[in-house]
Each structure stands twice: as C-alpha cells, then as structure tokens.
C-alpha cells in the first residue's frame, strides 16, 4: 500500500525547497486506467490541506493576509483574440476544429471581465481567468493550499465526438488521446506554469527538509507570502451525464501546490508531448508514475464500467477494458517522454497494488 504520509512529506519538501523562488509547485500523477490516480490525488490534497488547517488552528490565525501583485501578470499574451466570426462559431458549438490537434487556442473577453481560453473542444473545455475582485475581505479562515488539476474535464463532449469523421470509432475509443481537447489542456498547463514561476517576494530562513518538527516553519513562510492572483477555473467531468462541465474546478490565490492528475501527462504524442516541458520550465516539480499489475486494473476498470452503467455485465466490462483501456494503459508506457528524452528528470515510479 502507498504511504500517503510519506508522499505528503515529499510534496511539502518540494514546496519548502522552492519557497523563495516559486509561488507554486507542481506534482504530476500518472498511471494506467484503474491505477487509482484520482484517489491518490484526492488523498494527497486532503492530507496536505488538513496539515495546514491544523497549523492555522494551533497558531490561532483568525485569517491570512494577501498581498497585491507587485506587477501585472500576463497569462494570455501568447494567444490571439477570437474575431467576431470565430466567437459566433464558438457560441454555436464550435465543431469545425474538433479533430485539429494543431488548432491554437484563442481568448475571448467576457462581459464580466473574465477571459475565456477556448480550444478545439469549444466552451465545454474552456479555461476561465477571472478578474481580481475588489472586496475588502478576501481571506477565508481556513484556505486550502493544495488543489487538484484533473485531466478528465478535457474529454471532448459527446456532441463533439459526433462531429468526428468517424464518430463510431470516436465514441468507442473515448478516453483515448485523440478524444481529449489536448490543445486546451496544454494551454492550461502553460498558464499554471506561469503562476508557478512567480517570485513570492518572500525569503524564508527556515530549513529545507520537512519533518514533524519544522513543518510549522514552512507553513509560517507560506502564510506570510500569499499573493492576490486571479482565479483560474477549468472544466471537470460529470460521470452522471458523461460529459465535461465548465468551471467545475478553480485554482485560487491561496493554492501553492498543484496536483495534476491524468493518463497522458507524459505521453510523447501531439500536444501531450509538450506538457512535461511546460511543467519542467517552473523548476519546481515532480511526477509520480503509478505502477500496477494489469490483471488488477482489468478487474477494477471492468467493475467501474458496470457500476457507471456503461456495461451491463462484468464480462462486457472486461471486453471494453481490453478494447480501449488496456490499449491506452500500454500506450503511456511504450510512448512515454521518459523513453524518448534522456533529459527528463524528477519522474519516479510508485506502486499502488
């Protein structure tokens, strides 16, 4: 079994080691279908936030302070603004680029001051950057400092799959690399990387190794270096409706540890192949690759297919696993950026049997 406390210690040590130069750090969790990526990410988030909340309660912090940005941050300067024709197409569903891996996301200015980043999946897979709020009290009593960034929300919607040249194959292979808005997920990674690389403008004097005795020193440094950053919202995936839902997740100003979770974070194909470089550019990252026996995940995924209503029997679930999930799981092993790039670092295998 995984030692979650050890993983939490590693995550906090990554934050401690970079607290002087990076506002945020990135942790990537990858693995085949059924390996428990989501569960690992959720437990990691809960345990990190619980430790921080315990610290706040022990230190009697009524609220935490947030400093303004010392200079403006441009998160979308590399993107074109969608013209009127393109905006009209986006509002109508935006299906013309659904299979275009080379489509470059565009930005759309909203009436509320927010900026939408739209890729080939249209509004269903859009990323929203919200304007800074003007309210006087912006500080909750127990903010979360860890946030999950799941890849699932970038599944192309079923309506978008209907517009593939071969919609039957698109639906059958849903969950495969080409059935995601990889364009916009990559763009989200680039945006988040920019926020990671912000100088927190706070220089700690605490130790760089996290253990039970000095975690408070790290949390002191974190609490004294919050910056008023724009909120970044992105889609999640609703298994009940089997489609992405816009603005389901948010990275807020208090987020200091990003937990990216998904099947293709290290896949060496099309847009996926650029994610590692985007995250590595922060200089403050680690990837955990979940290793697990294939017969274990076959049973897990088959049962999940039955429970979700995708399949009517365990036998049918196993057949679906072998026709799609197994293929995708083997793909991320054979086509990993680790196999193609000797300069890849900070990627470690962990078992989750």
UniProtKB/Swiss-Prot annotation:
Purpose of the protein: ATP-dependent kinase that could be involved in endoplasmic reticulum membrane assembly.
UniProt source species: Kluyveromyces lactis (strain ATCC 8585 / CBS 2359 / DSM 70799 / NBRC 1267 / NRRL Y-1140 / WM37)
This protein's UniProt keywords: ATP-binding, Kinase, Nucleotide-binding, Transferase
Domain of life of the organism encoding this protein: Eukaryota
MF GO annotations: ATP binding; kinase activity
Protein name from the UniProt record: ATP-dependent kinase YFH7
EC number: 2.7.1.-
InterPro entries assigned: P-loop_NTPase
Family: Belongs to the YFH7 family.
Gene3D superfamilies: P-loop containing nucleotide triphosphate hydrolases
Residues annotated as binding ATP: 31-39
């Amino acid at each position: 079994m995984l030692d979650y406390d050890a993983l939490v210690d590693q995550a906090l040590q990554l934050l401690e080691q970079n607290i002087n130069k990076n506002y945020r750090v990135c942790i990537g969790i990858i693995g085949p279908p059924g390996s428990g990526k989501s569960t690992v990410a959720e437990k990691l988030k809960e345990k990190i936030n619980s430790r921080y909340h315990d610290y706040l309660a022990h230190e009697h912090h009524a609220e935490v302070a947030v400093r303004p940005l010392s200079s403006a941050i441009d998160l979308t300067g590399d993107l074109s603004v969608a013209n009127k024709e393109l905006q009209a197409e986006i509002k109508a569903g935006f299906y013309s680029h659904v299979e275009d891996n080379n489509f470059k996301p565009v930005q759309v200015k909203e009436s509320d001051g927010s900026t939408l980043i739209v890729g080939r999946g249209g509004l269903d897979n859009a990323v929203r950057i919200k304007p800074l709020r003007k309210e006087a009290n912006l500080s909750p009593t127990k903010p979360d400092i860890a946030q999950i960034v799941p890849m699932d929300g970038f599944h192309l919607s079923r309506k978008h799959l209907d517009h593939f040249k071969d919609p039957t194959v698109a639906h059958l292979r849903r969950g495969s690399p080409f059935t995601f808005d990889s364009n916009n997920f990559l763009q989200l990674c680039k945006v988040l990387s920019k926020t990671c690389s912000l100088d927190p403008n706070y220089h700690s004097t605490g130790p760089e190794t996290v253990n039970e005795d000095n975690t408070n020193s790290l949390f002191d440094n974190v609490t004294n270096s919050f910056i008023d950053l724009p909120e970044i919202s992105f889609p999640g995936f609703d298994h009940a409706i089997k489609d992405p839902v816009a603005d389901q997740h948010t990275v807020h100003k208090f987020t200091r540890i990003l937990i990216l979770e998904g099947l293709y974070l290290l896949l060496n194909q099309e847009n996926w192949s650029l994610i590692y470089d985007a995250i590595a550019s922060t200089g403050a990252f680690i990837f955990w690759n979940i290793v697990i026996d294939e017969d274990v995940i076959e049973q897990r995924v088959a049962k999940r297919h039955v429970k979700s209503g995708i399949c009517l029997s365990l036998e049918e679930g196993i057949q679906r696993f072998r026709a799609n999930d197994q293929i995708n799981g083997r793909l991320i092993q054979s086509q990993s950026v680790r196999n193609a790039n000797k300069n890849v670092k900070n990627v470690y295998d962990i078992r989750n049997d």
